[in-house]
Amino acid sequence: MWLGVITLFPEMFRAVTDFGVTGRAVKNGLLELHTWNPRDFTHDRHNTVDDRPYGGGPGMLMMVQPLRDAIHAAKAAAGEGAKVIYLSPQGRKLDQQGVTELAQSSRLILVCGRYEGIDERIIQTEVDEEWSIGDYVLSGGELPAMTLIDSVSRLVPGVLGKQASAEQDSFSDGLLDCPHYTRPESLDGVDVPAVLLSGNHEQIRLWRLQQSLGRTLLRRPELLQNLALTDEQTTLLAQFVEAMNKYA
């Protein structure tokens, strides 16, 4: 996957290129990330990248000319078919379904705003989609861009050691993930559930599915409203609720 990022702080993206799953993907050639800094496209000796908004008010906007030139440079490098995304609190909220959709694109250009945002005409003429990571205020689009890159890259074939890792992640099937355990078998008197030590793969599968359903019901019940549960899932969830009520 090819990724281009428009940012005033390209150094921040070393967190993506140098560390963890994404860093390994870059090293292995599965992920290619380039940055364009609007400061490199300025024409004054101060490298000015902000400007006053028409109509007054607090704060500044990103200056149009350097930003637009940076986007054009990224588009030229990406070639035909690249999708331009602006990280914005007004955008569609990123969820696993959205991540899956974005992962279908082989080339993405991410525009990271700063200050009070960017000129609306840039959004109208240069941006294909706006995406948000949540209803809260951040200082810029870099952290949302890194969040998007991390989540999307996990779905690129070969990035994870095992594809099952992505398939079993929380939200991959609309449910929260089940609890996980490692050694020791007993920790401060709390034992690993016996079924996980049984070696019975079908029973382990059913337990994990039931725990995912139950955890989703308890922590994010609204997610279940969007799912068409199978007969197996419905039965497992009913058993979970029955057991929970029994010991309540």
UniProtKB/Swiss-Prot annotation:
GO molecular function: tRNA (guanine(37)-N1)-methyltransferase activity
Annotated binding of S-adenosyl-L-methionine, by residue: 113, 133-138
GO terms for cellular component: cytosol
Keyword terms: Cytoplasm, Methyltransferase, S-adenosyl-L-methionine, Transferase, tRNA processing
Keyword flag Nucleotide-binding: no
One family name in Pfam for this protein: tRNA_m1G_MT
Subunit text: Homodimer.
UniProt similarity note: Belongs to the RNA methyltransferase TrmD family.
Annotated protein name in UniProt: tRNA (guanine-N(1)-)-methyltransferase
